[in-house]
């Protein structure tokens, strides 16, 4: 069953007194997309839409923060989320290459045990003449304390390959493919509860229910 709450996830998590969660799987605003303050302060449609046409998807908040503000926000939210999780729960968070150092700091400051970094290979994205193609995003994962080796969870890949969502299926500027989210959700215990503080297009919610 999907339960959707609209509001500041920090306020929600601070007051939540329901069942504990078995996994946190989420895709926060990256707050990167530029080398300078002016570039990072651009709208999300300017940063993440690879076309000169008007972007049909609305801009979203939280993507214009400086690095310290973003680190503080993420550490705060991940700490609040961990309190609402069972021991041994799993954390999975998307990011781009610029934010890996900050995100891994936030994960550990929040009390999670960092376990590794995964790769989403987007296949043919972002060609740049004279440079390596920026076709990957990254996923930091961790656990709330020990992670028993005998959990009823299969061996999962460390690299996920799928193109960006296109056409009529796309409803969000930074939407993650549901096929990838279905694979990632398998890290959660069968029948477990998954928390997504940054719901976005709802890919995690849809994948978790399948």
Region spans (language model):
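Core catalytic lobe of class I
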Residues: 1-210
């Amino acid at each position: 069953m999907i339960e959707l709450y609209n509001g500041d996830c920090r306020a929600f998590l601070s007051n939540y007194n329901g069942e504990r969660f078995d996994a946190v799987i989420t895709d926060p605003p990256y707050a990167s997309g530029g080398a300078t303050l002016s570039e990072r302060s651009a709208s999300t449609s300017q940063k993440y839409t690879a076309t000169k046409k008007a972007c049909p998807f609305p801009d979203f908040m939280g993507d214009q923060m400086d690095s310290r503000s973003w680190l503080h926000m993420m550490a705060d939210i991940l700490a609040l989320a961990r309190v609402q999780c069972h021991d041994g729960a799993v954390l999975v968070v998307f990011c781009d290459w610029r934010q890996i150092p900050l995100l891994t700091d936030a994960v550990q400051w929040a009390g999670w045990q960092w376990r590794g970094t995964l790769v989403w290979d987007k296949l043919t994205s972002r060609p740049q003449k004279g440079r390596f193609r920026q076709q990957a995003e990254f996923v930091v994962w961790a656990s709330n304390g020990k992670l028993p080796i005998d959990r009823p969870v299969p061996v999962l890949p460390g690299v996920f390959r799928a193109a960006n969502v296109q056409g009529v299926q796309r409803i969000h500027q930074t939407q993650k493919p549901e096929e990838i989210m279905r694979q990632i959700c398998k890290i959660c215990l069968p029948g477990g509860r998954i928390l997504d503080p940054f719901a976005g297009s709802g890919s995690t919610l849809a994948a978790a229910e399948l």
